[in-house]
Amino acid sequence: MMDLQGQFLIAMPQLEDYFQNTVVYICEHNEQGSMGLVINQPTDLSIAELYSKMNFMMKNDRTFSNELVLAGGPVHSERGFILHKKAAKEFEHSYKITDEMFLTTSADIVETFGSEDAPEKYLVALGCASWTAGQLEQEIADNAWLVAPASDTILFETIYEDRYPAANQLLGINPHNFVFSQVGHS
């Protein structure tokens, strides 16, 4: 079985609809299937707005970046997923992806946003992408996705519209050079 957990999936140009030009960070990959977050489709909702909509008592000492909440995928689109670096504090519903990367789905992490208890680096997504057992491997075999090692720089520092070309660059690919015909297939 491929080890895809903690890797990027990069959509091939022929992939259309929801996943066109997307980069997905794979949070979980096992015999039951796979789950990941699209990291380059921002919504128009900022993390600060999300925080206030969740009715937390806004504290004056909180400072928020103007980062946007991501559209993480078409599944559970009303549910929040926070991808973050290891934090000093443990959160109620956290899943270890790698030694340094975690996925948290409990509201206790949101309560830390803008404070010193927050993870140093994090992104917030509504919804996720999921695949049944063997489905993702088949899509990769069918050339729907490229697999690349994940990059913290792309995850947390690269602006949204540059994440797709930056992920392709990890593999030495310029997405503008893709040939759209399937060479060798008749």
Protein language model regions, located:
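A short aromatic-anchored loop/beta-hairpin motif
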Residues: 1-124, 129-186
